[in-house]
Amino acid sequence: KVYESEYTTAYGNRGIANLLYNWGRLYSDPEEALRVYTRECSVGVSAQDLGMMGATLANGGVNPLTGKRVMPAEHVPELLAVMATAGFYDESGVWMYKAGLPAKTGVGGGIVAVVPGRFAIAAFSPRLNEAGNSVRSMKAIQDIAAELGVGVFGPNAN
């Protein structure tokens, strides 16, 4: 259901895929790339799943429960940088100021935030704001980050 909804309204992503293809930066059919991308964005996960994904990133790419490396350590800072600068789409800058943590939102209302070297915070709430980010999940994570003093910017930076 999420896939169908996202795919039928993916006008912006469809345009980007076509531009990338036109510029020689997308090496497959733009519509097929859009289908694959949208399908990956529509995978259902729980708050526990998000928390474990974030904890794995906080642990340098090693799953903290299994001890198994699931991502090369050298890629973790790159991924966290992308999360910090683009994880909230148009609200990424505001998010970084308010929460001060790299994070990624999902269309289902999930958000995962990472405190590198320490832990992750995950939350789910379906009500989205105009930018497509969960209102309650954002507030919960901002409050937790402030209470723990883990944000790197804003009024509660340590």
Locate predicted features.
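Generic, ordered loop/turn and secondary-structure boundary motif
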Residues: 38-39, 44-46, 102
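Structured C-terminal helix/loop/strand segments within mature extracytoplasmic catalytic/sensor domains
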Residues: 56-158
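Conserved active-site and cofactor/substrate-binding residues in soluble primary-metabolism enzymes
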Residues: 11, 15, 32, 45-48, ...
